[in-house]
Design a protein with these regions (language model features):
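Mature catalytic domains of secreted/periplasmic carbohydrate-active enzymes
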Residues: 1-310
Length: 310
């Protein structure tokens, strides 16, 4: 069918099976083949890739390939080779789409987790479609930032696809999104980079309403937020409180109240990242009160740096 009908293709030629693969069994219609010959060929190919190119990261767009015997053999070889390269320190990262229990980094496509994970994990998603198409709609910079913050607050990492034209260029809308993310990161990056999840990931309506399921597991990664929705990260003696939408009034963060069992330390200072304005605040019995700043940035997610007394 089509303009390629009748054109010879060497992938269909049995003489070239070593370059491609053998003829598929009509009953073998799963995402991963059951053919043991091809499984061993795959393992040999990935082993060669690891040995020759020593990748920092490997990603499988599926669960653990071909079950425990093949998949775990590949991971063990990958990790062992990486430790030889790094004087006994494991720095390699392997992603695949199933729960890992720390054996590798779980990937959730177009979704997120609904709570803090003991083990690092990853969301992979796109600002639009996976590939370019004329007239497609993109996420806004604010939506990407909200998604990033929610993921990081739960011990996750965001792998973001940025759509390019067939020529490898970026459309003006895409450039604007990246510039918006860059502006926010310049002001608030310290609350993301090198941070860890706090004792809870957040508070507000988004933590109590029923979660919408994601496309490939987990919960939906892009969702609406209000100013009362808060996310947390921590670093040293500091907690960062992300207000997930533009504050319209004073903030009351109940997780940081005087009597909160979550935080037993007294607060020394509160500031807003990216601003020199002196923030008015008070740690009350029922909540940490933060008076709405007189000047707010152009982006939606505002970050407050809360330093505890030592």
């Amino acid at each position: 069918m089509g303009d390629k009908a009748g054109v010879p293709y060497d992938g269909n030629d049995p003489r070239y099976q070593d370059l491609y693969h053998g003829k598929a069994d009509s009953a073998d219609y799963g995402w991963l083949t059951k053919n043991p010959v091809w499984q061993k060929e795959w393992l040999a190919s990935i082993t060669e890739l690891i040995d020759m190119y020593k990748p920092d990261l490997l990603y499988s767009d599926c669960g653990l390939p071909f079950g425990n015997e093949i998949g775990r053999s590949m991971i063990a070889h990958y990790y062992n080779q990486d430790m030889l390269k790094n004087n006994g320190q494991l720095e390699a990262i392997y992603n695949c789409k199933e729960a890992s229990l720390g054996r590798f980094v779980r990937d959730v496509e177009r979704g997120a987790l609904d709570s803090i994970s003991e083990y690092p994990w990853q969301t992979d998603t796109s600002i639009g479609d996976w590939f370019y198409s004329t007239g497609q709609k993109y996420l806004s910079a604010d939506q990407v930032i909200q998604m990033l913050v929610d993921i990081v607050s739960k011990n996750g990492n965001l792998l973001l696809n940025v759509v390019q034209t067939p020529e490898g260029d970026l459309e003006p809308d895409v450039l604007q999104i990246l510039e918006g993310i860059g502006t926010w990161t310049k002001d608030n990056g310290e609350a993301i980079y090198g941070s860890r999840p706090w004792k809870k990931y957040g508070e507000g309506p988004s933590t109590t309403t029923k979660q919408v399921s994601g496309n490939h597991g987990g919960i939906k990664d892009v969702r609406p937020y209000v100013a009362e929705d808060i996310r947390f990260t921590t670093k040293n003696d500091t907690v960062y409180a992300f207000c997930m939408n533009t504050p319209v009034s004073d903030l009351n963060i109940t997780s940081l109240s005087q009597v909160s069992r979550i935080s037993t330390k007294s607060i020394a200072s509160v500031s807003m990242l990216g601003s020199k304005e002196k923030i008015k605040w008070k740690q009350n019995e029922d909540a940490l009160l933060i008076v709405k700043p007189s000047i707010l940035p152009n982006y939606k997610v505002v970050v407050f740096k809360i330093v505890f007394k030592k």
